[in-house]
Amino acid sequence: MITYRQDSLFLKGSFSRQIGIPTKHHDITHAILMAAGCIFTKGSFVKDIPYDPNYYFYGEELSMALRAFTHGYSFFHIPDVPLFHLYTDTSDIPRKLHWDPEDDEKRAVRWTELDKKSLNRLDDLFADKVEEPMNLGFDRSLEDYTLISGICLLYTSPSPRD
């Protein structure tokens, strides 16, 4: 299952980190987030929810999830997922990541600048300032997302639950 990391809610403004958690569910369950590298859906998804090149790492999956949700797509976790994205090696073998200082020195635009632009883009998405085709849809609202997720992205707070 993919969910928000409780220790990283609104870590950088409106951005919250996600985490994948293995579960022992035996049934298909509703989901509130998605992993960009593990999307199984109809082929028209890439036209309905095109990849937004204005994101660099942080924000891309949340943006896609919110755009898909507001365009009427639903997410599900299935038992016995046939693949897994191993982002961090469990044996703790060090490896370079894209924000490695040595590599970052060689870039025309630094990781920190790309990160700022990504997070600003996410804020613009929440404020409905992003134009088609990268905008939020009209089938569901961010308020609808708050109801199912318990996270109010507009006010950067957990939503009170009754």
Locate each region found by the language model:
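Conserved small/polar residues in nucleotide/adenosyl-binding loops
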Residues: 155-162
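Catalytic cores of eukaryotic secretory-pathway lumenal/extracellular enzymes that build
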Residues: 1-64, 70-124
